[in-house]
């Protein structure tokens, strides 16, 4: 109740303090820092510490008074140690230095940072002539002077100015004032820090922060006051301070209004505690840091009305710790700088605001906070392996032909989602003509979805009596004339119905004109001849009925329709349309060829006129011939490289410049005016070609970079080199610019032309020579990889540079740069696909090995757990067996005790027989046989684990071999056959690893099944043992009760036996007395036989006789009962022996069960 009352009294002050701190900076109340801390104060000089010292002071006007200073013991009345300056020491205690020692210092070394407000010093003797006060805020590492004090500042500290300081580094000297009554002793010095900084424009909080923070304080007495001499002996000169008061509090940076004792600190009673009770969410002994989880802004001392309160970090409930990051604070423009630590619930980020990799935001509104981020639910078959899902939406990164948020659906037109497919799904094997465009096949089954009237597994056939599959809209009915046609089924491609004799037309609806049958031509009257056509490339009747000209199907060409038309790739008879980019390139190239041919025809007239005289013409012609010869030598080499092609291009360029630079008459001026527009069009056409080429090249490089195969990169580089070589040969954009320059040069020459010259004949001869020499056909054949039919010279090279009209390829022995590049590109694609499949198989093998290791670990853990269970069960059963054995011995001893009565024996026997054992002997034996059978079937765990380790080691070895094969495949440079061989070896190794892992998995599953069977048997056994234990506990209590009853009955039996023995003895004595009495009665009867009257004595004798007979009868009856009891005890003893024999048999069975269980426990304990 008292504590509650004190708390009630302190509560208003605490609430007021909180309110004060909530309005701005707050500071604790001040007190004397020296009280309780005098042990931290020291002086550089103290009188009488080693021996007593005498000092003399003036007494009156002309007398001297001398005293002793003995500071060896602190409690001496004349001890003047430094701790006497504390206000708690009393008025008659002071500190005094040694005589004539200067300078002297008093220094206070605090153990914590404190806030100083006021210094007050009372002197005992003369006031020093000069002194200074300084402080340290870093425990004595650096010192700063508060103020210099002197009676004469100019002479004592000439380098220090007087007045008020103007800034924090400005230190001034203040004169010491004299006492008004003229006394020389008992002066005072007071230094108030707020008054000291009164001239500095700063807030009170700033002044306290700059001046009040101290860890050490030092007062240096630098000059003794002059001592007046008025007698024969001068007074002693010394420094003495009677009282030093340091008003201050704990230093809290404006974040606390009270101080608390230091936990675990000194027990000395102090007036000012040194631990701040922090407010504003700050912490630390001096509130010099933000409290845990309040680091959203940097810590700052409180100033005036601004508390600079530390703000709580925003971790969205996923963390309780954070730290301040200046970089984050600057990036947020001073808004928040807290960075959360140890984010939980699978979150991360400076505010735990986003989910970790492979987790995404739970979109369920009522989800608990620990389920904010849930694992990605990507389908491993359709998602890119290892790629994380989107952290906000959960959208997985799908393979190329897979879609859906979980990547569990094939895109339209694809089916068969599998993990092994690097693209996820494969294209539907459906006809592009007969299947639906929006969904060619079903995503799950791959069954093709046909257009109307289209049938077949691949939707590649028209339904009966339908045709025109190529329309792409489904098949149409044949509409055969039912009277004039042989059947309703028409040709699926042409729609031609089978007509009766004399009828024709598509539907047999009109009378037929007699003509030669299909695949023949001519007239029926003059005879029909067979068409000379390859009918695999013809359509309809095969050839024209009149001329015999073959009618080629679209995509086929040639006189016999046995060649692929330009724009169709592959080999005859399979002619499919080339890629759309070919059509764009081909159109532009044909336009270019047409314009170049027009230019060539337009410039032919320029060679007929006479040229200007040019003395350097001969040298230029020779130079052209040498370059042509050099080009011919380069082209005759065994291989064509990029440098060779560049030299050929330079040679051709030089020849053209030579030809175009010759001085000729230019008669066709009107044609020259149109050349500028033609060249501009050609320039724009080549610019478009160049952009298309670069775009395709970038796409190809991007696709190539996704495949890490070294062989693929090598082949790609080879293809790029060949492509650049072909591009340099076929690129004419630079030639057009050169033609433009040549045209300008020709115009200059035209302006210089003033008449005839002597070079016309030479030009004509050169023109004739250039028309036939050099022959560029071999060079073109090397570049194009095929035989050119028409000759190509610098003067005349008709047609395309690499004609493809016949559509034939150069075959496997092609040596052309362009076909080689194409072949290399296709080969690279196949190798890249094989490498991707190989990587997928390696990943699957890794997963299988990891699963096997985890399964082995689980089996080992199960075995250890089983061992622990068996060991525990063994200990429990041993304890139960020991208790059972002791109980049996006690029961046996109890039953064989001769003093135990039959009723007690019967109760014990019935209690023993009422015990419920696990089952009868047959059932126990059957359970033991089941356990033995299961144990016999259970494989040796050590051997299985050893085999498992061997299998895992073998799998790892095979995996290493596969990795080496893959590395060798990556290191191949051009050896494609070796790459394929290594891939086959890797596939074989992977198959062996998979077989090994499957065998290991079977072994592990067998172990797990056996462990389960053992557990199924052990669990009932444990329950039986526990049941026996409970019954034995109850039986034990019952035995104790029966033993107590038996002991009581035994005591009663002993008492009854004693009574029976006494009664028997009395009966024997009575019988003997009766015999004697009977004998005397006979004698008396004989003596008194005459008298029939017995008298009084006779009556007495008769009564005695009757009593004796009654007593004898009772005695005989008691003897009979004792005999019956003896026989009954004999029968009980025999029953006890029988029951004891039964218990011995049961004890043997229990021993057998325990021995067997101990054996199995030992076996399983060593199987780990």
Curated annotation (Swiss-Prot):
A Gene Ontology term for the protein's cellular component: collagen-containing extracellular matrix
Tissue-wise expression: Found in the basement membranes (major component).
Positions in coiled-coil regions: 732-754, 827-879, 944-1129
Signal peptide interval: 1-17
Region (Disordered) location: 723-760
Primary subcellular site in the record, as a coarse category: secreted
Disulfide bond residue pairs: 250-259, 252-276, 278-287, 290-310, 313-322, 315-340, 343-352, 355-373, 376-389, 378-396, 398-407, 410-425, 428-441, 430-448, 450-459, 462-475, 478-490, 480-497, 499-508, 516-528, 531-543, 533-550, 552-561, 564-575
Localization annotation: Secreted, Extracellular space, Extracellular matrix, Basement membrane
Comp. bias intervals (Low complexity): 727-739
Laminin N-terminal domain: residues covered: 22-249
Region (Domain II): 576-781
Highest taxon, organism lineage: Eukaryota
Positions with biased composition (Basic and acidic residues): 740-750
Single biological process term from Gene Ontology: endodermal cell differentiation
Region (Domain I): 813-1168
Region (Domain alpha) residue spans: 782-812
Glycan-modified residues: 220, 601, 806
Alphabetized Pfam families for the sequence: EGF_laminin, EGF_LMN_ATRN, LAMB1, Laminin_N
Keyword vocabulary terms for this entry: Basement membrane, Cell adhesion, Coiled coil, Disulfide bond, Extracellular matrix, Glycoprotein, Laminin EGF-like domain, Repeat, Secreted, Signal
Residue stretches making up the Laminin EGF-like domain: 250-312, 313-375, 376-427, 428-477, 478-530, 531-577
Subunit structure, as described in the record: Laminin is a complex glycoprotein, consisting of three different polypeptide chains (alpha, beta, gamma), which are bound to each other by disulfide bonds into a cross-shaped molecule comprising one long and three short arms with globules at each end. Beta-3 is a subunit of laminin-5 (laminin-332 or epiligrin/kalinin/nicein). Interacts with ECM1.
Function summary: Binding to cells via a high affinity receptor, laminin is thought to mediate the attachment, migration and organization of cells into tissues during embryonic development by interacting with other extracellular matrix components.
Domain notes: The alpha-helical domains I and II are thought to interact with other laminin chains to form a coiled coil structure.
PANTHER family to which the protein is assigned, alphabetical: LAMININ SUBUNIT BETA-3, NETRIN/LAMININ-RELATED
Protein name according to UniProt: Laminin subunit beta-3
Gene for this chain: Lamb3
């Amino acid at each position: 109740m008292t504590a509650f009352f004190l708390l009630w009294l302190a509560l208003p002050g605490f609430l007021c303090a909180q309110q004060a701190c909530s309005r701005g900076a707050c500071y604790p109340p001040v007190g004397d820092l020296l009280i309780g801390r005098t042990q931290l104060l020291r002086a550089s000089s103290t009188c009488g510490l080693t021996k007593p010292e005498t000092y003399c002071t003036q007494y009156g006007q002309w007398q001297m008074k001398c005293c002793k200073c003995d500071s060896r013991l602190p409690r001496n009345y004349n001890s003047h140690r430094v701790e006497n300056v504390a206000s708690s020491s009393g008025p008659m205690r002071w500190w005094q230095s040694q005589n004539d020692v200067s300078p002297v210092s008093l220094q206070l070394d605090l153990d914590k940072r404190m806030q100083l407000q006021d210094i007050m010093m009372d002197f005992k003797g003369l006031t020093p002539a000069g002194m200074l006060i300084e402080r340290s805020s870093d425990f004595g590492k650096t010192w700063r002077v508060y103020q210099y004090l002197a009676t004469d500042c100019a002479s004592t500290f000439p380098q220090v100015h007087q007045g008020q300081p103007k800034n924090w580094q400005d230190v001034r000297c203040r004169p010491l004032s004299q006492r008004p009554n003229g006394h020389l002793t008992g002066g005072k010095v007071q230094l108030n820090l707020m008054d000291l900084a009164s001239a500095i424009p700063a807030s009170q909080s700033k002044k306290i922060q700059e001046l009040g923070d101290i860890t050490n304080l030092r007062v240096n007495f630098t000059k003794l006051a002059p001592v007046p001499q008025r007698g024969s002996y001068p007074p002693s000169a010394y420094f003495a301070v009677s009282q030093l008061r340091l008003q201050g509090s704990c230093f809290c940076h404006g974040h606390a209004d009270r101080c608390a004792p230091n936990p675990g600190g000194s027990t000395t009673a102090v007036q000012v505690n040194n631990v701040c009770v922090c407010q504003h969410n700050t912490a630390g002994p001096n509130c010099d840091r933000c409290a845990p989880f309040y680091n959203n802004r940097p810590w700052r001392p409180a100033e005036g009305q601004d508390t600079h309160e530390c703000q709580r970090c925003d971790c969205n409930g996923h963390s309780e710790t954070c730290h301040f990051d200046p970089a984050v604070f600057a990036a947020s423009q001073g808004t928040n700088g807290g960075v959360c630590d140890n984010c939980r619930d699978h979150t991360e980020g400076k505010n735990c605001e986003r989910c970790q990799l492979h987790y995404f935001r739970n979109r369920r509104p009522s989800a608990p906070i620990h389920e904010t981020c849930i694992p990605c639910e990507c389908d491993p078959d359709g998602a890119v392996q290892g790629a994380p899902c989107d952290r906000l939406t959960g959208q997985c990164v799908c393979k190329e032909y897979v879609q859906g948020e979980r990547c569990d659906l094939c895109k339209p037109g694809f089916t068969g989602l599998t993990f092994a497919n690097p693209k996820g799904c494969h294209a539907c094997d459906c006809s592009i003509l007969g299947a639906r465009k929006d969904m060619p096949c079903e995503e799950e089954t791959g069954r093709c979805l046909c257009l109307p009237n289209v049938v077949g597994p691949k939707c590649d056939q028209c339904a009966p009596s339908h045709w025109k599959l190529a329309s792409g809209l489904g098949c149409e009915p044949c509409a055969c004339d039912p009277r004039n046609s042989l059947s309703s089924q028409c040709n699926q491609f042409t729609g031609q119905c089978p007509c009766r004799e004399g009828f024709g037309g598509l539907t047999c609806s009109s009378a037929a004109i007699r003509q030669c049958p299909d695949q023949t031509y001519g007239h029926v009257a003059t005879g029909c001849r067979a068409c000379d056509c390859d009918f695999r490339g013809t359509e309809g009747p095969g050839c024209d009925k009149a001329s015999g000209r073959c009618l080629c199907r679209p995509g086929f060409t040639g006189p016999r329709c046995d060649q692929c038309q330009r724009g169709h790739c592959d080999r005859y008879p399979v002619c499919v349309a080339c890629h759309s980019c070919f059509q764009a390139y081909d159109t532009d190239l044909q336009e270019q060829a047409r314009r170049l041919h027009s230019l060539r025809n337009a410039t032919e007239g320029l060679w007929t006129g006479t040229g200007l005289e040019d003395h350097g013409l001969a040298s230029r012609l020779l130079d052209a011939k040498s370059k042509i010869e050099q080009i011919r030598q380069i082209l005759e080499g065994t291989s064509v490289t990029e440098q060779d092609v560049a030299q050929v291009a330079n040679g051709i360029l030089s020849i053209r410049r030579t030809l175009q630079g010759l001085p000729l008459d230019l008669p066709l001026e009107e044609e020259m005016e149109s050349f500028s527009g033609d060249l501009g069009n050609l320039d724009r056409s080549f610019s478009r070609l160049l952009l298309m080429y670069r775009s395709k090249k970038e796409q190809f490089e991007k696709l190539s970079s996704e495949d890490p195969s070294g062989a693929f990169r090598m082949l790609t580089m080879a293809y790029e080199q060949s492509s650049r070589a072909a591009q340099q040969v076929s690129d004419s954009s630079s030639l057009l610019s050169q033609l433009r320059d040549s045209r300008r040069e020709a115009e200059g020459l035209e302006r210089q032309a003033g008449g005839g010259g002597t070079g016309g004949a030479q030009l004509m001869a050169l023109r004739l020579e250039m028309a036939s020499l050099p022959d560029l056909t071999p060079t073109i054949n090397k570049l194009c990889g095929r035989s050119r039919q028409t000759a190509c010279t610098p003067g005349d090279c008709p047609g395309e540079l690499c004609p493809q009209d016949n559509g034939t390829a150069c075959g496997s022995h092609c040596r052309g740069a362009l076909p080689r590049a194409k072949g290399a590109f296709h080969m690279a694609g196949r190798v890249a696909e094989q490498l991707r499949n190989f990587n997928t198989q390696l990943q699957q093998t890794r997963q299988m090995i990891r699963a096997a290791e985890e399964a082995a670990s689980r089996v080992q853990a199960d075995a250890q757990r089983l061992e622990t269970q068996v060991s525990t069960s063994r200990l429990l059963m041993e304890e139960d067996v020991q208790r059972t054995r002791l109980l049996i011995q006690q029961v046996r001893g109890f039953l064989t005790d001769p003093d135990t009565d039959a009723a007690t024996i019967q109760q014990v026997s019935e209690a023993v027989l009422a015990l419920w054992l696990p089952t009868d002997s047959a059932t126990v034996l059957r359970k033991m046989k089941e356990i033995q059978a299961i144990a016999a079937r259970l494989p040796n765990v050590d051997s299985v684990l050893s085999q498992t380790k061997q299998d895992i080691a073998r799998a790892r070895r095979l995996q290493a071999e596969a990795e080496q094969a893959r590395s060798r495949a990556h290191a191949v440079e051009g050896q494609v056959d070796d790459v394929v061989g290594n891939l086959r070896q890797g596939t074989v190794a992977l198959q062996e690893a998979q077989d090994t892992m499957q065998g290991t998995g079977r072994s592990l599953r067998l172990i797990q099944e056996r462990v389960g069977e053992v557990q199924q048997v052990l669990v009932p056994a444990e329950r039986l043992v526990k049941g026996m234990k409970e019954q034995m506990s109850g039986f034990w209590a019952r035995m104790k009760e029966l033993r107590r009853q038996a002991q009581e009955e035994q005591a009663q039996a002993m008492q009854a036996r004693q009574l029976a023995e006494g009664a028997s003895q009395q009966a024997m004595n009575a019988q003997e007395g009766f015999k004697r009495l009977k004998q005397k009665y006979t004698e008396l009867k004989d003596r008194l036989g005459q008298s029939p009257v017995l008298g009084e004595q006779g009556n007495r004798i008769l009564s005695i006789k009757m009593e004796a007979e009654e007593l004898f009868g009772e005695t005989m009856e008691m003897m009979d009962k004792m005999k019956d009891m003896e026989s009954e005890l004999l029968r009980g003893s025999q029953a006890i022996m029988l029951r004891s024999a039964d218990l011995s048999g049961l004890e043997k069975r229990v021993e057998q069960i325990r021995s067997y269980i101990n054996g199995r426990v030992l076996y399983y304990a060593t199987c780990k």
